[in-house]
Amino acid sequence: DEVDPDGKVLNSLIDTLMHLQKEFANLKYAFLTVHKARSFGSGSERLYVTNKEIKNFEPLGDI
């Protein structure tokens, strides 16, 4: 006896997996975009960017 003769459960799982793969790809792209926008290198000095200022990471070591 087949529990899912029409493959509805399997098709539903495949659809869900494909949706999650797309969401993960979008999340990964969004993270990389934010990371690239927020930090960048200038020579050997690492910089960070906020909406208010651009500074290097050295002052952050005092926190």
Swiss-Prot record:
Entry keyword set: Disulfide bond, Lectin, Secreted
Compartment(s) where it occurs, according to its Swiss-Prot or TrEMBL record: Secreted
Cellular component, GO annotation: extracellular region
Signal peptide: none
Expressing tissues: Expressed by the liver.
Recorded superkingdom: Eukaryota
GO molecular function terms attached to this record: carbohydrate binding
Protein name according to UniProt: Myotoxin inhibitor protein
